[in-house]
Structures are given as structure tokens and as C-alpha cells.
Amino acid sequence: MSRPSLLRVLSIPLVALLAGAGVPPAHAESHVPCHTLPDAVLRHAKAEAESATIRGCVKEKENGRLSYEVETVKDGRSRDILLDASGSILEVEQEVTPDSLPAAVAAAIAKAAHGGKVGMIESVTRGDAIASYETTITSKGQRREVAFTPQGAPVKAD
């Protein structure tokens, strides 16, 4: 029985690796210094943040679209502002307390948790209305994200 050559053994993983080399990821993000954001983005983010402290900035590219997330904190609660490259606000994620949730959302999260640990809960606002509530649930060493409409219906993944 002959042994395969080293070239043959390495060629399969190498071809697999190179096959994806030219394909950009669907979603990529990186932390960037806030002063490097476009002027309009920084100006609108600061106006939206009001008196909150800016913790950091993230540059995101998803499906070819560039956006920026400005992470803020006020009174111990996080609030993240997502803006497009022109400075228009796309959405705001704001930490909320469990007792502030609509009853249907609280019930949906409790049901999804199945006794697991519920992480920080955020409201996601698009335009002038809350579009969804998001959280993470950790159970048996597994962590998963869940999202619900304000009426408590599950939000389908994009």
C-alpha cells in the first residue's frame, strides 16, 4: 500500500482555503477611533447621544453597505446608534429593564429562555417606533440570540 505524497495531502485543504479567498464576508465590522468617522456621522451621533458618554465606534460593512455604530452609555445603560455613511440614523439599540417590557414580550422571552439565563435586553428603534426587542439566552453552555416584535411574535432572522 503506497502512502500519498505530501503535495497530494496538502492540496485538498489548500484548494478549499483558496476557494473562499476572494469572497468578502457578508458582514464585517471593526472598531475604529471615533475621530476617524465622517463628519456628518459624528455630528449626528453626538446630537442623538445627547449627554451620554461615547464608549467606542465601529465601522460595519454588511452586504456591501457601509455603516457606523456609535456605542454610548448613560446612567449605566448602553445605547448604540447605527448610522449610514451620510449620517442618517438607521436604528438605535437601547438597553431596557425587564419590568419596562410589554407583557407579550416579557412572556415570549420567558418562554424562549426555558429556565436559561437571559442577558441584557435591548429595544431596537427604527424611525420613530420600536421595531423589536433583542436579548441573548444562555442555557446548558449554549448561547443564542432571540428577537421579538413589540407584540411578542418572534422576529425572523435576516
Give short role names for the model-derived ranges.
Residues 2-158:
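Long, terminal "pre-/pro-" and other extracytoplasmic accessory regions
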